[in-house]
Design a protein with these regions (language model features):
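An alpha-helical interface "stripe"
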Residues: 1-190
Length: 190
């Protein structure tokens, strides 16, 4: 999408702010706002520690406290509607720019409800000296240059169109694996 946004923000905030109230019906805006603060603010810790905290939020929801006008209340704000997947908003962005230690542009980002869960790095098979290893090196470079994007990462994908592999931010290149089907066989990625 062509979106006017702050490049320092890796989230697709417009979508996130629209979807959270829809999948958390019955919760007041104060609870949603508190969850937004929590998922946008990570103080201290390594990238992996921040990613683990976000993964907990993604799986279990964000525990929040808010004032309802009479008393302090607590709630759990879900980031994804696992019960009704069609209530979630899926977006793929081509060339998503993030300004971290420097400005970088990831080839593709897969967003779920405005959360950048998948980073895809593509390399051209027509370039002789380029392969999937170069895509891995580029992903590692992004983790150093724009670490805020990878706080929210579920997994990364690298491809040179001859080979497509997926792995996590902690995986070495040898731990990135080819796509498999439900029965455990490998998908043809040609």
């Amino acid at each position: 999408p062509n979106v006017m946004r702050d490049y320092a923000e890796p989230l697709y905030v417009e979508v996130l702010e629209a979807v959270l109230p829809q999948i958390n019906r019955g919760l007041p805006q104060a609870a949603i706002d508190e969850a937004m603060v929590k998922i946008r603010t990570y103080e201290g810790g390594t990238l992996v520690q921040k990613n683990e905290l976000f993964t907990d939020y993604l799986q279990n929801g964000v525990a929040v406290n808010y004032f309802d006008g009479r008393e302090q209340c607590s709630a759990n704000v879900r980031l994804v509607d696992y019960d009704s997947p069609l209530h979630n908003r899926f977006t793929i962005a081509n060339q998503w720019t993030v300004d971290g230690h420097s400005v970088r542009r990831a080839d593709m980002i897969v967003f779920v409800n405005g959360l950048p869960l998948v980073v895809v790095e593509l390399k051209s098979p027509s370039r002789e000296n380029t392969d999937v290893s170069e895509a891995y090196a580029q992903l590692r470079n992004y983790m150093q240059e724009i670490p805020s994007l990878f706080i929210y990462n579920a997994f990364c994908v690298m491809s040179d169109q001859a080979m497509t592999k997926a792995g996590t931010i902690t995986a070495g290149e040898d731990r990135f694996m080819q796509w498999k089907t439900v029965d455990g066989s490998y998908e043809d990625t040609h």
